[in-house]
Amino acid sequence: MQDVTHGERVIYGEGPIQERGGPLVVISGTMADRLLRMLQLMDGHERTAYSIWRLPEGETDPTVVGETFIQAAGSAQAMTVEARVMTSDGTAHLFTVGRQEPVEGPPTTIWINDHAEVTVSSNELFTAEEAAVIFLTFYLTDSVSQPYRLREFDLGGA
C-alpha cells in the first residue's frame, strides 16, 4: 500500500457546487500519467477545477489542505493554473502562473461555477498537457519552477 503524502479535489461546476476529494494515489501508470489524466478530464462545464496539495506534516487525513497547493480551472483546452506557494518571507501567497511571453489579445474569462470565474491574460492560459508539467513539478517540489512567472492573485473583494 502506498503512503499517502498528497490530497486531491475535483470541483463540479454545473448546478449546486459539488466537490470530491481524497488521497492522491496512482492505481496504474505514473504520477505524471495520473495528473495529466485528471487535467484532461476537465471540460469547463461539469468538471471545472482540479487541485492537489501535500498533506501537512504528521497529517493522515487526505482532505486536510496544507499551506501550499496548486489548482487549475477551466477546460482541458484552456485552463488557468494557480499556486499557493511559500515566499521568501516564509508566508504562503496565491499566484496565477504564466509563461514568460508578451500578452496578446484581450483577457479570457474562465468559468469555474455559478458563483466564480477568473479573468486571465493570454500567457496565463494552458492546455491540460502544459498544466500537467506544472502540476508534476509542484507535486515533486511544492513550487512552480522556471520558466514560469508568478503574478500575485488579486483576491479583490474576497
What function would you assign to each model-found segment?
Residues 1-49, 84-158:
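Acidic, proline/glycine-rich low-complexity IDRs
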